[in-house]
């Protein structure tokens, strides 16, 4: 690893919607530059997590350094910083964009611009990145590059006359992409003489070396053995190992302004090296940290409980370890009369929640019961105190509260024109407020709605996909809190309230949701030896009820003809036994019942 002049460094990332071929393109660039030998190559090289390969999405950020000899004969260093494309991980995208000077905008030549591409492009424009449009999958029969170029020009306002037509899968246009990175992406500014400032854009936990921090040097120089200080947390560490990612770790002695690398410094937890934090030297420290760091806040909460309560310590250890590599995950212990001991966890969104659950089950062999997700409500009490409530069972009673506010999001849906009616109908039933509708092209439309986050986190995404045969894509961003007519609905099974099934609903929809929920529970809870009443209640008022009939033995089977009083005696004896059993019996509630809230038909 020789010293490189700053003018020969290019830092870039790839922006794309899910499935537009970003990871495949990254693979081709690694191969073309000889960074990864053909025999070591596996698909989605930068997606290290097994789960990422399986779902075909990028979750954690990766980075790779490539040496490339351009056609002008000069040797360049290209740093690719891979970004996730999913809406939940937009905070990961924003910090990786901060580490770049340029971005490849990858758009599927048959699909066109999608919602998440747009959101990420706007982030890139905010960071003043040079954007190079690339039309991928050009060899597909449905590809229409001219239409997609027009779309990019109209929607984003980028000049597409020089857009590169490529196919990452068959390797078309890869050389052209590399050349345009060298010629169009500006080099980093040369600030080697300034005090050290480096931006952390990712970190992960290594069980042997502690936290490995991926960073980009913005100003100054960092050397192995330096004592560094993290400006947000104020903690100091000594660098044990310094290196670059090509894409495997290669140790170096020092890194200068503009370079991308990693540090191991015996850091105990990822929370100590927060992403977006600034690294500086302990002695000659910088006065100002780098701007734009925001701590990621969980938007969605749910309860996680082990099916076997003896494994509670294992779940705690697993969450601790996961939090080491996922700073956005929050958790705190929670107990529930129905489920025993568990944790209340906070996530960035639904996909993040699913991934954490799946990783807990897969990597730590845990069997989990999860409660339905809820969002954070703001409750103002009569004393004027503002409480943040992330668990419906913690909502103060009506006589103690002045108002409840819920988070609202701005939802942008890009859809083919013929599904607009179905989507407007869906948004209307989810308490959406229509804001705007724009035609991107003759066939594609953007719908903009404002709606409560609680309506989006349940199954809005699935409903949207099924109503548009999978063609629509969406993006949402938080716009603040608004007051609403919200009530807590409790579910009583056998006259006992079950905390994990409690939900906060809008008063107008309470009856429909309650009715649908008890009907769903009736299907899911198996019959017992005694009759089980199911009720949905707001306060002490029952708004919907169902009952699961008892399984009963035919006690009259032995009576042939004979006296009616004999039959009555046997039936009364059975009824007495059932009554006693009901008083002391417990109801087994299966896992599916707790997720029933998600799969309700909410269209009342």
Curated annotation (Swiss-Prot):
Name the UniProt record assigns to this protein: Elongation factor 4
Disulfide bonds: none
Organism encoding this protein: Synechococcus elongatus (strain ATCC 33912 / PCC 7942 / FACHB-805)
Principal localisation: membrane
CDD domains associated with the record: EF4_II (cd03699), EF4_III (cd16260), LepA (cd01890), lepA_C (cd03709)
Annotated catalysed reactions: GTP + H2O = GDP + phosphate + H(+)
Domain of life: Bacteria
One record GO biological process: positive regulation of translation
Domain annotation tr-type G: ranges: 7-189
Alphabetized InterPro entries for the sequence: EF-4 (IPR006297), EFG_III/V (IPR035647), EFG_V-like (IPR000640), EFTu-like_2 (IPR004161), G_TR_CS (IPR031157), GUFP (IPR027518), LepA_C_sf (IPR038363), LepA_CTD (IPR013842)
Residues annotated as binding GTP: 19-24, 136-139
Membrane-topology annotation of the record: Peripheral membrane protein
GO molecular function: GTP binding; GTPase activity; ribosome binding
Alphabetized PANTHER family for the sequence: TRANSLATION FACTOR GUF1 HOMOLOG, CHLOROPLASTIC, TRANSLATION FACTOR GUF1-RELATED
Sequence similarity: Belongs to the TRAFAC class translation factor GTPase superfamily. Classic translation factor GTPase family. LepA subfamily.
Subcellular location: Cell inner membrane
Pfam families reported in the protein's UniProt record: EFG_C (PF00679), GTP_EFTU (PF00009), GTP_EFTU_D2 (PF03144), LepA_C (PF06421)
Keywords (A to Z) from UniProt: Cell inner membrane, Cell membrane, GTP-binding, Hydrolase, Membrane, Nucleotide-binding, Protein biosynthesis
């Amino acid at each position: 690893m020789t010293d490189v002049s700053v003018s020969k460094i290019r830092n870039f990332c790839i922006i794309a919607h899910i499935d537009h071929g970003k990871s495949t393109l990254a693979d081709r660039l690694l191969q073309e530059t000889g960074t990864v030998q053909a025999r070591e190559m596996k698909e989605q090289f930068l997606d290290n997590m097994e789960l990422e390969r399986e779902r075909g999405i990028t979750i954690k950020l990766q980075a790779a350094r490539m040496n490339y000899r351009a056609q002008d004969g000069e040797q360049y260093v290209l740093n690719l910083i891979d970004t996730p494309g999913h809406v939940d991980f937009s905070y990961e995208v924003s910090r990786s964009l901060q580490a770049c000077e340029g971005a490849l905008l990858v758009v599927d030549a048959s699909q066109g611009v999608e919602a998440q591409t747009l959101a990420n492009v706007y982030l890139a424009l905010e960071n003043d990145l040079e954007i190079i449009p690339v039309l991928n999958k050009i060899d597909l029969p449905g590809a229409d590059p001219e239409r997609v170029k027009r779309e990019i020009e109209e929607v984003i306002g980028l000049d597409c006359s020089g857009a590169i037509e490529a196919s990452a899968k068959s390797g078309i246009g890869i050389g052209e992409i590399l050349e345009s990175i060298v010629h169009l992406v500006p080099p980093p500014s040369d600030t080697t003489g300034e005090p050290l400032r480096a931006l952390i854009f990712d970190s992960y936990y290594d069980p042997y070396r502690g936290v490995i921090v991926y960073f980009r040097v913005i100003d100054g120089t960092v050397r192995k053995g330096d004592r560094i200080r993290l400006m947000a947390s104020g903690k100091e560490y000594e660098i044990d190992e310094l290196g670059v990612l090509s894409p495997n770790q290669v140790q170096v002695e020092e890194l200068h302004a503009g370079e991308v690398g990693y540090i191991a410094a015996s850091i105990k937890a990822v929370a100590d090296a927060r992403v977006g934090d600034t690294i500086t030297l302990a002695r000659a420290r910088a006065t100002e940290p780098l701007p734009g760091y925001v701590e990621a806040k969980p938007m969605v909460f749910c309860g996680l409980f082990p099916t076997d309560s003896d494994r509670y310590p294992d779940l705690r250890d697993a969450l601790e370890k996961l939090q080491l590599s996922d700073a956005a995950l929050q958790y705190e212990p929670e107990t529930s009369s129905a489920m025993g001991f568990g944790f209340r966890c906070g996530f960035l969104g639904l996909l993040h929640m699913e991934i954490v659950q799946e990783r807990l089950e897969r990597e730590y062999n845990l069997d989990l019961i999860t409660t339905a997700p809820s969002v954070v409500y703001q409750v103002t009490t009569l004393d004027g105190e503002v409480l943040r409530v992330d668990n419906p069972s913690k909502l103060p009673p009506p006589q103690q509260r002045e108002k409840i506010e819920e988070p609202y999001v701005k939802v942008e849906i890009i859809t083919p024109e013929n599904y607009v009616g179905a989507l407007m109908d869906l948004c209307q039933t989810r308490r959406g407020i229509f804001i705007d509708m724009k035609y991107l092209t003759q066939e594609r439309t953007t719908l903009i709605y404002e709606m409560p986050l609680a309506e989006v986190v349940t199954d809005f995404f699935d409903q949207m996909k099924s109503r548009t045969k999978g063609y629509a894509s969406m993006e949402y961003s938080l716009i603040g809190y608004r007051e609403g007519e919200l009530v807590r609905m409790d579910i009583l099974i056998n006259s006992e309230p079950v905390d994990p099934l409690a939900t906060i609903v809008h008063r107008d929809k309470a009856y429909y949701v309650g009715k649908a929920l008890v009907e769903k529970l009736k299907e899911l809870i198996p019959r017992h030896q005694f009759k089980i009443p199911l009720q949905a209640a707001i306060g002490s008022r029952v708004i919907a009820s169902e009952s699961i009939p008892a399984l009963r033995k035919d006690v009259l089977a032995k009576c042939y003809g004979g006296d009616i009083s004999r039959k009555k005696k046997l039936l009364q004896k059975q009824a007495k036994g059932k009554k006693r059993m009901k008083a002391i019996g417990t109801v087994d509630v299966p896992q599916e019942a707790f997720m029933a809230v998600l799969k309700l038909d909410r269209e009342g």
